[in-house]
Amino acid sequence: MADGSELYTVESILEHRKKKGKSEFYIKWLGYDHTHNSWEPKENIVDPTLIEAFFTREAARKAEIKAKKDKMAAGKKGASSKASASVSKASASTPARGAKAAPKPPPKKSPPKRQRLAGGDIRPDSDTDEEHSSADKKSKAEDEEEVEDDEEPVPKKKKEVQEEPEEEESVEGEDEEESQEVEDLKEDEKMEEDEKEEEEDVQLESEKNEKEEEEEKVEEKKEEEEEEEEEEIQLVIVEKTVIETTIVEPAVATPEPSEPSSSEKAVVENGSSSAAAGNSASKPEVSAVEVVTVEDDDDIAIIE
């Protein structure tokens, strides 16, 4: 971050993380390249609108990703439903394996044999016999034609049996595509769950941060209240001390002067006269002194 001599400007917030219960943001600084990007605590971001703009962008980005995934999942679901419909249609058109061919009609009864006469000769055919034999031949020919008609679809069935492996291969390919789509859907669901968990973690972290901020505010308010209470207590103590240490001097009554008695007046007068006499006696009169110097050092005369 900036030191005391230089102030850095935040250009944009790139990422957000939680470290030791505190929010940190990856900052791109204005006028600096990506090599100067740094993780900074929330307190270092002066403008709170930058944080709000970052979380708004993150929410829009996640919503866009989720919408794209939902769209992809819906497309894959439609493709899988179409593939399953085509598979069911192909299976319906393909005959079941081991299907039995149409049963052949029961063979017609052969005409009765000619009867022999008593002499061992065969009875000649009558007109009715000839008609019956011709009718039998005709019916036999019709039966053979019917049998041929019944046998005509057999080669077609063989061809269908030969085409079954190709259809099986196509079905297997469709099954693989369906399994791949299912795996893709599972991966998408897993990614959505991871993103959802990440969003829940971010939300929990934001709630935790808000709770911590509220607790810090409560603690600060509590400390302020305690400081105010301490100041009030100190003020009360100071006032009490001032009251106790203040000295109140009582007023001293001055007695009124009374007139002295006659004896006291006499004593006072005598005292004043004696005091005056004493003062005069104690103060000797000073006269001029003349000092005469004599040649002899030992004799010094003082003349008044």
Swiss-Prot record:
Biased composition (Low complexity): 75-102, 248-292
Keyword Phosphoprotein among UniProt keywords: no
GO biological process: heterochromatin formation
PROSITE patterns linked: CHROMO_1 (PS00598), CHROMO_2 (PS50013)
Keywords: Chromosome, DNA-binding, Nucleus
GO terms, molecular function: chromatin binding; DNA binding; methylated histone binding
Protein's cellular compartments: Nucleus; Chromosome
Stretches for region Disordered: 63-235, 248-304
Top-level taxon in the UniProt lineage: Eukaryota
Composition bias type Basic residues, residue spans: 106-116
Residue ranges with Basic and acidic residues bias: 63-73, 122-141
GO cellular component, one term: pericentric heterochromatin
Domain Chromo: from-to ranges: 8-66
Keyword Nucleus carried by entry: yes
Sequence ranges of Acidic residues compositional bias: 142-152, 163-204, 212-233, 293-304
Protein name: Chromo domain-containing protein cec-1
Species assigned in the record: Caenorhabditis elegans
Gene from which this protein is expressed: cec-1
